[in-house]
Every structure is written in C-alpha cells, then in structure tokens.
Amino acid sequence: SSISLCTPKKPFSILVPLGPEPLFIDLQDALLENRFKKISFHDELIGAQEIWSRGDDFVFLGRGRFTRWASWAEVGIANAGTATEQLVGLGVPVLSLPGKGPQFKSSFAIRQSRLLGGSVVPCKTSESLAERLNFLLNEESVRRSLGKIGSNRMGPAGGSIALARLISQFLELN
C-alpha cells in the first residue's frame, strides 16, 4: 500500500475524512499490515472516530470530517474532483490518484491539473503518489509555491454566494 512507501523526514499524521464508504473495517487490514495499532475509538478535540499509531506517526479516521480537517492539511490526496478543488482553494497542493469510478478518470485529472496551474499533481500509480508525497512533505518551499498557485487560480472564498446572487438578480429582472 502507499502508506508503506511514505517516508517523510519527520513524524506525520494522516487525516482520513471518509464518506459513507469505505467502512473503517475495510481500512483496518492496510493499517495493521503497516504496523499501526488502534489506540482510540473516538477523539472529541480532533473529531476522529478512530486513531491509529505507529511510533510517532498517526492516522485519524473520521466520517464526514472533510470540512473540518481540510484546512489542517499540508498535502492532500484525493480521487474526487470537488474535494480536490476545495483543498486547492485553501492553498493545499493535491496529489490525485484516479480511481475505478466513472467520475474521475485520468484525462479529467490531467485537465484539472492544467486548469489549476499544476497545484494538482495526477499520479498514475500508488508508487508515484508515494514518491511525490515524500517530496512534497520534505520540501516546504515547493508546497507553499504550489499552494499559492492553487489558491490564486481558485480565487477567494465566497464565489458560490456571489454567483447565486447574480443569478437571483438576473431572474428578478426577467
């Protein structure tokens, strides 16, 4: 798994905000294979439902925690277009790994990366994702540069509200 290939120079924490799937039990084997041990079932402060540790490294699992955790990230890993764009808008560089689903194919990831100025880096394999993740975690200046490019491309917060107001005004006039 990719986590076994992740070797940053300092201790790390991985925040895993989950949707309805996968189930926590589905992730358990990969964590155990990589010598992580479950240390807690719930943490109010962070909002994790499960916490796993391996020495000074931690994995936090939480269902529905994306909004809360996204701004804490140094690097994002995503396989969904909207989550990727939300992270980029927060100034977080993202590694994308196209999945098996119809909504996120390699061609989409490449176009998305181009539109977002390279702040999203599409990866074709788990190995290339781990290699790029290690690089970004160890190179703060590159992370900051990519984060700045991404947040500039996405623009400031509030775009959806402004667009809704414009549409509402247009509809009132017609």
Which role fits each region the language model picked out?
Residues 1-174:
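Nucleotide-activated sugar donor-binding and catalytic core shared by glycosyltransferases
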